[in-house]
């Protein structure tokens, strides 16, 4: 699966349920803020319960799909659109190569989630794919997604 980040949004990171067992070494658990929305996003795609997703805060990303995949969008209502047309939340959505996913401002909530049937190809660090920005580990290069990431 391939996605190109056209706009990173305010704070878009890769997250799962986080890493436990390393707090005594100074690492926070990290992980998703809204566990229910995270689990529903993965359930809709028949993914493993702890499969990594994109979590975004207040302003969602703009993503271009460079290959076909199936996604689900959960969490707050950020008025998602695919190619300029409203997209449904809390359902599986087939994305074609070249499709553009955008979000408006939040109508409800502060966080949204995008799960992928073809999984996010990021390394597992200490048992988790979650981004820990302070420690610069996990997720995509240990940081939030930025414009033009691929």
Task: Describe the predicted segments one by one.
Residues 1-150:
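Conserved "landmark" site that anchors the functional core of diverse proteins
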């Amino acid at each position: 699966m391939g996605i190109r980040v056209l706009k990173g949004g305010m704070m878009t990171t890769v997250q799962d349920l986080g890493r436990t067992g390393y707090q005594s070494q100074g690492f926070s658990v990290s992980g998703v803020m809204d566990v229910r929305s995270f689990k529903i996003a993965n359930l809709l795609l028949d993914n493993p319960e702890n499969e990594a997703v994109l979590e975004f805060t207040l302003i969602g990303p703009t993503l271009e799909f460079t290959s076909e995949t199936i996604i689900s969008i959960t969490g707050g209502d950020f008025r998602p659109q695919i190619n300029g047309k409203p997209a449904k939340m809390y359902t599986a959505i087939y994305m074609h190569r070249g499709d553009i996913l955008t979000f408006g401002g939040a109508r409800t909530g502060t966080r949204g989630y995008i799960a992928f049937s073809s999984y996010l190809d990021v390394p597992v660090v200490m048992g988790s794919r979650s981004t820990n920005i302070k420690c610069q580990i996990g997720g995509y290069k240990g940081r939030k997604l930025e414009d033009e990431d691929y």
